[in-house]
A protein has these predicted regions:
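Positively charged n-region of N-terminal signal peptides that target proteins for export
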Residues: 1-5
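Hydrophobic h-region of N-terminal signal peptides that target proteins for export
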Residues: 6, 10-19
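Cysteine-nucleophile amide-bond enzymes
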Residues: 16, 20-215
Length: 215
């Protein structure tokens, strides 16, 4: 009897292990939220002023493109908007027990029809420079901005919500010294209160359903 229980337990554990190793089937239009492994002042500054799903401190986001059997991520990153192989995107994430801290959000059924148009808009941004100062209408783009713009409805109404940006530390309520240095370096006033987006806010959007975690 004990041997049967041990054998059954072993089979169960093996099944769980194999299930965990099975690749997730990404679809074009899936949105990948990433906690970046690079601990630069820029990444820390983003994490200090935004709130993410389950406090995961997302500092980056991109959109999946499945093309000719390969999986890419359309992303606005430094120095420009680009098409990145999925493997490279995952390797750039912080890891937990060897697994990347990346979460997959999938637009809910009512928004699925918006994906083909969104992908074409995202492709039109390829090669555009990264926006280090998070300003609208300057022909430069940051990661969540291209997704916000790509998923605008034809009538201009947004699927993802833009909110007044704040560069104040979540703990102190004061403007983060990291951001002060950042905007001084770019000789630009801090765009406090200007409408914008962030990976953290987008990860909590009601327009998507979290369908997978890589960690």
């Amino acid at each position: 009897m004990i041997k049967k229980i041990i054998l059954s337990l072993g089979v169960l554990l093996l099944t769980i292990a194999l299930s965990a190793q099975k690749p997730f089937d990404l679809k074009t239009g899936d949105i990948l939220f990433q906690t970046n492994k690079a601990r630069t002042s820029f990444v820390k500054a983003i994490e200090n002023v935004t709130t993410s799903l389950d406090d995961l401190n997302f500092s980056h986001v991109g959109v999946v493109l499945v093309e000719d059997g390969q999986v890419f991520v359309l992303e606005a990153t430094q120095p420009d908007v680009c098409k990145t192989p999925l493997e490279k995107f995952l390797k750039q994430a912080k890891s937990v027990d060897g697994n990347p801290v990346v979460v997959v959000g999938r637009p809910k059924p009512k928004y699925q029809k918006s994906i083909p148009r969104a992908i074409e808009i995202l492709k039109s941004f390829l090669g555009k420079p990264y926006d280090y100062v998070f300003l609208p209408d300057n022909d430069k783009y940051y990661c969540s901005e291209i997704i916000y713009l790509a998923f605008l409805r034809p009538n201009g109404k947004p699927i993802f919500k833009a909110t007044p940006m704040s560069f104040k530390d979540k703990e102190t309520g004061e403007t983060s010294p990291l951001w002060k240095k950042h905007f001084e370096r770019h000789k630009t006033p801090i765009p406090e209160g200007i409408l914008g987006t962030s990976p953290g806010e987008m990860s909590r959007s009601k327009a998507i359903k979290i369908v997978h975690r890589y960690f």
